[in-house]
């Protein structure tokens, strides 16, 4: 286009070379008007302007902006796109659960952990199992034997020797016959052995003479004497009074129920309304090891008895200065359980030194001791007034033994359990008692009849090492080892109440005590993480949970006359009062 314009301009220029030519030759074509060529010339006023804007902070696509909405929900099982490795294994977003324990934090798809689906051929599994039982080796199941050369576990040398043969293969190696000395020449009368020849690897054992036998008998007798364990003698019982005077100015001991504490401790009527405890108001410290159990004084609850793994039993004040009144010393091993009689004047203690001891609460004197050479796990007085001389103890040899304090002898044995007996609770106006055991069963007994008339054992049941009777006597709260509290009826049929199951705490492996509030509105229990859990009785909802002890919170007792006072004990050696 530009070349055509240039040629046109040149043709116009050649025609206007001189004025004479233009004048002489009038017949030439006239010049075009200037307006007609305006579109071919460059306008001097038109200028090309380039505007450049300088921005010191340009917009940049941030990586976080691009990744919004890409976070995966850890609960989702299927993903509709292909996420990156970083996206799939990024840490979880959102607030952290403050009550999440170490067991709960681990990924799992079932209650006890994470189970991966796997398929094992029954024949191949049985083949390897029998091979291992017969020859002592089997293929390593953790390796893919199709891709890796076969590796064995167990006796690898035997596997190489047999070339990996299994019990189902016909070419297995036959055991070598034992070789005998050969001398089959019958003409050799003195040296002929025949079928009576000895084996090559046979060893001759000479019978000791009479003198040697006597020496051997003496040596074995000495060894037996050394090996015999000396029978554990009961430890020397003593008591320490920690207050200056045992009696006040009126001659009353600390067993006297106080009347100036703001609560009627002699009343048999429970408080109308109970409330949740919220703060710690006192700590009793005196035990050097974990506290096993705490028991309140019968009816009034103005005294507290505690037993510990430091082999000591201590009596504390609940009101006033809350002092330690007396220490009872007499067991050589950890004390497992304690129990007051109905009046509170005496109490029993059961310890791992295989002794049950009867103590006087006021003087601290050890009245008598009982043992059948087995470890007692629990002990209970018969609550009836006319049977205060009888008590029962659950033993480690699967028996419940009944003793008479007056004679010191065993008067009855209940031996139907298949495991160590953990708890004994009297029900139905003390005519019957309920026992639980390591055999995961619950049995109900008539008093003094050694045959259980009710046996409860479901396949889904776990061991229940702590059982408590409700204040109204209608329900049994059982601490089950599958982290829940089960409620059984305690009057007629002893049925499981499936509407009342309390969950949310971690007690697997610990016999944490359960208790009720006096008005039956709350259920309390410690747990393995040292927390105190409080549930609502009607709705089974977990109302409150707070840290009570640094170690396992093994015991929790609600004061029978207070609206919100709870006493807890733990394996940190402390006893705490909450209100």
Swiss-Prot record:
Biased composition (Low complexity): 1-19
Location (main, coarse): nucleus
GO BP annotations, alphabetical order: embryonic brain development; mRNA splicing, via spliceosome
Residues making up the signal peptide according to the UniProt record: none
Subcellular location: Nucleus; Nucleus speckle
Renumbered residue ranges of the record's region Disordered: 1-34, 204-237
Classification of source organism: Eukaryota, Metazoa, Chordata, Craniata, Vertebrata
The protein's assembly and partners: Component of the catalytic spliceosome C complexes. Component of the postcatalytic spliceosome P complex. Interacts with PPIL1; this interaction leads to CDC40 isomerization.
Tree of life domain: Eukaryota
Role: Required for pre-mRNA splicing as component of the activated spliceosome. Plays an important role in embryonic brain development; this function does not require proline peptide bond isomerization.
Post-translational modification: Undergoes isomerization of the peptide bond between Gly-94 and Pro-95. The reaction is catalyzed by PPIL1.
UniProt entry keywords in alphabetical sequence: mRNA processing, mRNA splicing, Nucleus, Repeat, Spliceosome, WD repeat
A GO-annotated cellular component: nuclear speck
The protein's name in its UniProt record: Pre-mRNA-processing factor 17
A Pfam family this chain is assigned to: WD40
WD repeat copies, ranges: 286-326, 330-369, 371-413, 416-455, 459-498, 504-545, 548-578
